[in-house]
Amino acid sequence: MHALLAELTSGDDVRAENSIPAIVELGMTAIPALLELARAEDADSRWWAVRALAASPHTRSEELIPLLSDSAPEVRAAAALALCNHPHESAVDALSQSLFDADALTAGLAGTALVKIGSPSVPNLLEVMKGAPMGVQILALRALSDIRDHRAIPVMMKVLNEESAVLQYWAQEGLQKLGLDMIYGKP
């Protein structure tokens, strides 16, 4: 394991990427070492640890959630992407908070992970729509549109009257995906 972790943190992206299948093949025995590496001082080492955790079918969502609060935006983004591979409703609250991340990639990937989780994400996403900044509302509405849950219909209908063309677009997309593809507009 030590040799594989050395490859993973070698600073050479090709060597690091090539070490991941062997690390994953170790199964559950690799997870504790990767979680320890995810707390390393070096952001690049943390990123590669998250990358390897994302590839492992033995990684639990609960192990990835704390990494959404990492000090490095690239590690937060990797954690959100990892949660796309390991979606679980236990991550909904943390991912909902990550929609507000200053890093646009992290916020967008958090929205994608919420879509992968599906229906359990809807109450949090509806709450976000109540007063979040416009950029965050766009991410939330895009997620609601992709989840296709009827609980989002009132919010989508309300958004059709908003000034934002992007919000209107995602509301129309969501309504269309729900089979409500009529033209909605003010008379």
Task: Mark where each language-model region is.
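Structural detector for internal amphipathic alpha-helices that build alpha-solenoid repeat scaffolds
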Residues: 6, 13-28, 36, 44-58, ...
